[in-house]
Structures are given as C-alpha cells and as structure tokens.
C-alpha cells in the first residue's frame, strides 16, 4: 500500500470510491469539492493506493487553529487492513509539521466501525460538549 497526495488523474477513481463508501451529500458536487481542495493545501488530500488502484482517501484541512478531516473512506473490499489508520496517521504527521495542535474528525453517529477505529486511535468523543452546526454557503449543481 502506498499513501500519496491526490493527483489529477485520480478524479474518476476517487469519486467512484466516494460513491461506494456513501460519502457524497446532496447539493455537493464532488468534482467541485476536489477542485476547491486543489486550490488550498492540496498536499493534505491523500489517497491510499494498492496495486495501482485508489482504495482509500482522506481530505485534510488546517486553518491555523485546528485541523480537520473529511472524505475518510476505504473501499469495502479493503477494509480491516489498516488503510484508514494509515491515512489518518499520515495526515496527522503533515498537520503536526505545520504546528497544528488539534484535529477534528466528524463521523456519522451510526458509523460504529469508524467510531471504534477513532477510539482505538485515542480520539475523544466530544459530542456532549458541543453541537455542530453547518450552513451551506454555495450549493453546487445537483450531483
């Protein structure tokens, strides 16, 4: 397995993977999301590749205060092999190198496998201390 930075020729494979992993949301065009990411900290957009196939992704961000991770997904046939752990670990290293003191992962509350993995990686469940609100500022064309 190789963890590397997203490349332009990964577009189709990544979007297909996101569809398989049920990571796409209504009103969010994944191509536009990727294009936006490529204009800001593209080196924090990582893919896991096995024998030339993209099997995992994580899209990180850092605003100078906190790090964040989105689009963490691993192809169903490749789960349980440590790929998500490796993606998170590589992102953490990149964020630490930038001086990032903390990272936030937002995981759907019904995703037991990812919650278990986060707990094993010593992430704390902080949902009782705050509520997450979001507001879509730009609605992409329906995907």
From Swiss-Prot:
InterPro entries (UniProt xref): Acetyltransferase_YpeA, Acyl_CoA_acyltransferase, GNAT_dom
The enzyme's E.C. designation: 2.3.1.-
N-acetyltransferase domain sequence ranges: 1-138
SUPFAM superfamilies in UniProt: Acyl-CoA N-acyltransferases (Nat)
GO MF: acyltransferase activity, transferring groups other than amino-acyl groups
Residues annotated as transmembrane: none
Entry-linked Gene3D superfamilies: 3.40.630.30
Keyword annotations: Acyltransferase, Transferase
Family statement: Belongs to the acetyltransferase family. YpeA subfamily.
Name of the protein described by the UniProt record: Acetyltransferase plu1384
Organismal lineage: Bacteria, Pseudomonadati, Pseudomonadota, Gammaproteobacteria, Enterobacterales
